[in-house]
Regions:
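Short, flexible, basic/aromatic active-site loop/helix in glycosyltransferases
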Residues: 137-176
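Short aromatic/hydrophobic "clamp" motif used to bind/position activated sugar donors
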Residues: 88
Length: 304
């Protein structure tokens, strides 16, 4: 009789062979005897040595190969077809976890059946906390104050700091709106209730969408800083300076992800907020997204 799977880990990878190896080594150290862990790596049409490395060095991994880059949502949904665990951990290939992380996250979720998803404190390899592990939902006001830079000036303000909610105590566990797809620990029955990742998002925004649906369904989303993950932010997309040298994201992929980051804002707003705000606010928000997109693509084109 096969053992019950406690946690199914899905790691999505596209041309991150160096980081993927480090991620899997850290996961191996976290595969403690008291937990039965299923590990699934979904390769999103990599052209580097990622597939060969997984097959040769990590035979305990279930490898799923996609001939096409399905994006973040599509790739994770492909991995979900193999899931057997009571819990699911969506883990980026550019993340390394602490040896005790999985045990602690499961224990935390076990203590409260109303928690649908949680995320730990995520720190950047270059230093400091990754703010995206602790977010409010991107309402028009939260987004406006964030993009105008008011959150940086007044990070503890409940009016100007809604985007990352840094007015809350970051050293103790508490409920939040949205965590981070980089390390997203979800109860399997929660995901069955709310549905899989929305594949209209290619890259960016899909994690906030999923957290939003989890909250809508009445589950709690928790920030749990008593365990830690380390993040090479931007390595998967190749959009950030610190990703250079550790990823081989092509110019085509980087342009596609830059466009997707803007499209995600529009998809999310139309899906969840269009009916909540009047037509004038909606017109202003959508126009703002278009303008933001033009500036982002201009900045991208000037970097080459």
């Amino acid at each position: 009789m096969s053992k019950k799977v406690d946690i199914s880990v899905i790691i999505l990878s596209h041309n991150t062979e160096i980081l993927l190896r480090a991620c899997l080594i850290s996961l191996l150290k976290a595969r403690r005897g008291e937990l039965h862990i299923q590990t699934i790596v979904v390769d999103n049409a990599s052209t580097d040595r990622s597939i060969q490395i997984v097959k040769k060095e990590f035979p305990w991994v279930e490898l799923v190969e996609s001939r096409k880059n399905l994006g973040y949502s599509g790739g994770n949904n492909l991995g979900l077809k193999k899931v057997k665990g009571e819990y699911i951990l969506f883990l980026n290939s550019d993340v390394e976890i602490k040896p005790i992380a999985l045990v602690r996250m499961k224990q935390f979720m076990d203590r409260d059946a109303k928690i649908g998803a949680s995320t730990p404190k995520v720190e950047l390899f270059r230093g400091g906390m990754d703010p995206d592990c602790h977010r409010g939902f991107p309402t028009p006001l939260a987004s406006l104050t964030y993009f105008l830079g008011l959150e940086k000036v007044f990070p503890k303000s409940r009016i100007f700091g809604q985007y990352h909610q840094f007015y809350l105590d970051l050293e103790i566990p508490h409920e939040i709106d949205s965590g981070f797809g980089t390390f997203m620990f979800v109860r399997s029955k929660t995901l069955k209730m709310v549905g899989n990742w929305d594949e209209r998002y290619f890259f960016y925004g899909e994690d906030i969408d999923l957290f939003y649906r989890i909250k809508q369904a009445g589950w709690k989303v928790m920030y749990y800083p008593e365990t830690l993950a380390l993040h090479h932010k931007g390595a998967s997309s190749g959009l950030r300076k610190e990703s250079q040298g550790v990823t081989v994201a092509s110019k085509e992929i980087r342009l596609k992800t830059a466009k997707a980051s803007i499209e995600a804002m529009e998809i999310f707003y139309k899906k969840f907020y269009k009916g909540k705000y009047n037509s004038l606010i909606t017109m202003i928000v959508l126009a703002g997204i278009k303008i933001k997109g033009l500036f982002r693509l201009l900045k991208f084109s000037l970097s080459f």
